[in-house]
Amino acid sequence: MKSSASLDALLVRARIASGAPYRYHIVSHSHENRGGRTFDLTTETDGLKYRAKSCSRGLCTGFYFDGDRSFDANFNDTALPLSAQVDGLQITLRAIVSYEFTAPNFRIIGGQLSEREPVLREGRSYRRLAIAPFRGSLLDAILEPKSGLVVGIVSDERKYAFELRDQRKVDGKITLPYEIALNGTVVERFERRAIENTPLEEPVGLVPTFAGGPETIAMTKLVRASEQPVVPCSIGGERVNCLLDTGNSGLSMSLELAEKLRIEPRGGAFNVSGLGKYVTGIVHAPALTIGNATYPGAEYVVLHDLRPYGYDVVLGADAFARARVTIDYPKHTVTIAPSGPIGPSDLFPPSNAVAISFENFIPITTVRLGEQSVPLAIDTGDESTINLAYDYYAAHPDIFKPSGSTPVSGIGGTSDEITGDIARVRFGDYDVVHPKIGATKSLAANGKGHLGSGFLHHFAVTFDYGRSRLELTAMPGDTNVRAVP
């Protein structure tokens, strides 16, 4: 085992040889082929921050790591966290690749470093360091002993090994690998890498602007009986109905509206999944106004079977991510307000707050169904009360006893829903007694099913995606809802 003086000397060599990339905003470009299509890849690093964008025919999706948590980003650059937890693995990967583990203050701020037995590769001995930044996972970095450059990242526990190959000078200041392999397979081959003088920017998404204070909007009453939150809106000079749908991962519009606005699909085929599946296109539509909130022009998925439901636009994750949206079911109103900056007061959420996570840009919360805790998607676009994925219900048939079945329809197709009721559902700090419950075959569910507007109609619900929570207020005098002591 090497002495601490030897380890310190190695860290100095590594910092000098690499040029300390953690001090710079680095932009890299590459390409990859998937499914017969070519994608332009752009990756950016700035200290521990990391951003990746994959683009084809002008449409991009991506990934973002803010130094603590990881986020997925959709076509409209809306980013939502993959988990509420700190991503310890990303922290350590970024600390090694950026050489932040060589920074003089790395151990002062809580990072841990120790040297393990050297490894032999093709007859050569390499130094092996166990590295764990503050709040990071433990990974091993393999260093070339003379220069100190990182040539590998290894996790025996996770059974993977990265190789950092083809090390080159970038802009005369830093040394970076141009090829990265995982378990022997090349996963990234950079064509260009450069230092950018401006800071790395986080994904912004669609930030609404407001003409005055928050405005209360009356819901539109549909011809059919429905608790769905549908409100009037305008886009491209057309007045249409918009559904506020937390079960939608972005934005959608009817084929009829796209044709009326004379906007053509671009970016190739897009797969739509609901009760069925089909392939459609994506259009770029102009700004949309709802109440006194205006969202900028954006990408919309075109749905050919949307208009019969009574609306032409579906406002999903993109409309919720950068605003506070209150759907007051008892009063049949919607209010959209600025989300506001996150500050120290957010460490103490209101008493009626319910934590949410996200799966495919859909909010998920844990609900107590009888005696079972079940993660369910909060889906304002689903007309049902509680709609379980059939596979989950088949594995847990004791949740409810079926009393009938009914045909259901949705985007992409039709199905059958087994129906019944359940004695009690715990949602946040409320018990809802004897709500309807069902299980639908072929339901493309997030979580283990959906809480729909048929259940949410007991409450005024404020969705605050930026704080990963919703806030519940029960309708006064509702005998089916009981506050939990």
Model-identified regions with their sequence ranges:
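N-terminal mature ectodomain segment of secretory-pathway/periplasmic proteins
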Residues: 1-77, 208-211, 250
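Short, non-transmembrane alpha-helical segments in secretory-pathway proteins
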Residues: 3-18, 93-109
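Structured N-terminal alpha/beta-domain signature
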Residues: 11-16, 25-27, 70, 114-115, ...
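A short, amphipathic edge element
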Residues: 24-26, 101-116, 160, 281
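A cross-family detector of function-defining hotspots
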Residues: 31-35, 116-120, 272
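Pepsin/retropepsin-fold aspartyl endopeptidases
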Residues: 41-44, 48-53, 77-79, 86-92, ...
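Extended Lys/Arg-rich, glycine-bearing segments that form polyanion-binding/interaction patches
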Residues: 69-102
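N-terminal beta-strand motif that seeds the catalytic metal site of vicinal oxygen chelate
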Residues: 138
